[in-house]
Amino acid sequence: MKCTALIVTFNRLEKLKKSMRETVEAGFSSIVIVNNGSSDGTREWLSSLSEPGITILNLNNNLGGAGGFKIGSQYICSHSNADWVFFYDDDAYPEINILKHFSLLDTSSYRIFMSQVQDTDGRSCRMNLPFIRVPSTVFETIYYAMRPEKFSPAKTQVTDVQTVSFVGMVIDRKVLNNHLNDIHDELFLYY
């Protein structure tokens, strides 16, 4: 199974260095980094990387997460033979055994997965939590504010969800290719 990491970065060079170290150690088949017009030395550092399988896409402007992920997705879909694409930002650090854990999942029934995104203290990042159902009424929105766990999947099992965030998403490259236009880069952060 060929897995590509798609990392979007903007002006967080030290975090990107850590993310890259951990991404390389995790053993991805290839890595695509979209540099969103960073001005902090990122472009220069990226040009010094010599590991095989790393592709750098330097943009002149910051297109935000959505724009960066769209550019990276377009590149991967037209230049890669990856089976799966793992999406994350420069401040996300994949666990060393992420690919081993992913290989144990039954990928025949699902084409998109969402990783559990945690902060450095091991707490779930609320902005990256998928919804098992999206609040659709005023009552459900208030209920979500009081009891968000009722709208979030269990952490220890595969569960159907209605939403995913870019950070932590794992998607079949063929599905990604069929849905490139669904990445709305004008939203900057989310699609």
Regions found by a protein language model. Give the residues of each.
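Short, well-formed alpha-helical segments that are part of the catalytic scaffolds
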Residues: 12-25
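A recurrent flexible, glycine/aromatic-enriched loop bordering the glycosyltransferase active site
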Residues: 151-171
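Short beta-strand-to-loop acidic/aromatic patch adjacent to the donor-nucleotide binding site
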Residues: 81-91
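Donor nucleotide-sugar recognition loop
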Residues: 161-164, 168, 177-191
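Conserved donor NDP-sugar-binding/catalytic core segment of glycosyltransferases
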Residues: 97-128
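Hydrophobic targeting segments
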Residues: 2-7, 22-23, 29-34
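Glycine-rich, basic loop-to-helix element that forms the pyrophosphate-binding segment
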Residues: 59-76
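A conserved acidic beta->alpha catalytic loop
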Residues: 35-44, 61, 92-93
